[in-house]
């Protein structure tokens, strides 16, 4: 299945601080998606509805996000190490990977989500993505799961849980809305080192 989970990979106090900084930030934007050519879709609200902040891994010296980003990046790399151990021989020849592109912090209010099934590397502008990672920042008990279509797995959001999975079409997934609760996540991708 190649879906790896690690409970409490990110400490609760770090999760709460990320949420706190997210809510205080003036840099929040409506979540967006792009088409297969990399063009941002103007009205994607029927596909995905969220509020996002995008951070670059290079922002490690940022006075607000720097320490938090370092902790998040370390958590992802420790998770990647455990992922490789878990799946051993299947990943024997997998080259070193690095966090690529953006790190996205996302807030889904009640009834918001990434409604449609999707994969993470099926267009020219994101084909370098090998694995997806996501950390749930809070518990959601009423819906809010990440559903993996072909694996028939529903991953429940619990504070600090790290999930890593292949970015390809084999792992179509979607974010199920919670009708009553807000969900916070951090997500990004791992790609081959350049």
Tell where the protein language model's regions lie, with residue ranges.
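Fe(II)/2-oxoglutarate oxygenase catalytic core
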Residues: 1-162, 170-194
């Amino acid at each position: 299945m190649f879906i790896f989970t690690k409970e409490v990979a990110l400490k609760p106090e770090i999760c709460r601080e990320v949420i706190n900084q997210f809510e205080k930030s003036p840099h929040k934007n409506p979540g967006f998606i792009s088409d297969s050519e990399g063009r941002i879709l103007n009205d994607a609200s029927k596909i995905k509805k969220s509020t996002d902040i995008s951070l670059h891994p290079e922002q490690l010296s940022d006075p607000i996000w720097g320490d938090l980003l370092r902790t998040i990046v370390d958590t992802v790399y420790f998770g990647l190490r455990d992922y490789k151990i878990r799946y051993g021989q299947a990943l024997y020849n997998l080259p070193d990977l690095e966090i690529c592109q953006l790190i996205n912090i996302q807030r889904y209010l009640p009834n918001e989500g990434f409604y449609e099934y999707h994969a993470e590397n099926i267009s020219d502008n994101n084909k370098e993505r090998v694995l997806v990672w996501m950390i749930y920042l809070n518990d959601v008990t009423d819906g809010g799961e990440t559903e993996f279509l072909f694996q028939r797995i529903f991953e429940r959001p619990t504070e600090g849980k790290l999930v890593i999975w292949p970015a390809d079409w084999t792992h179509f997934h979607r974010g199920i809305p919670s009708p009553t609760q807000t969900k916070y996540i951090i997500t990004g991708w791992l790609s081959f080192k350049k």
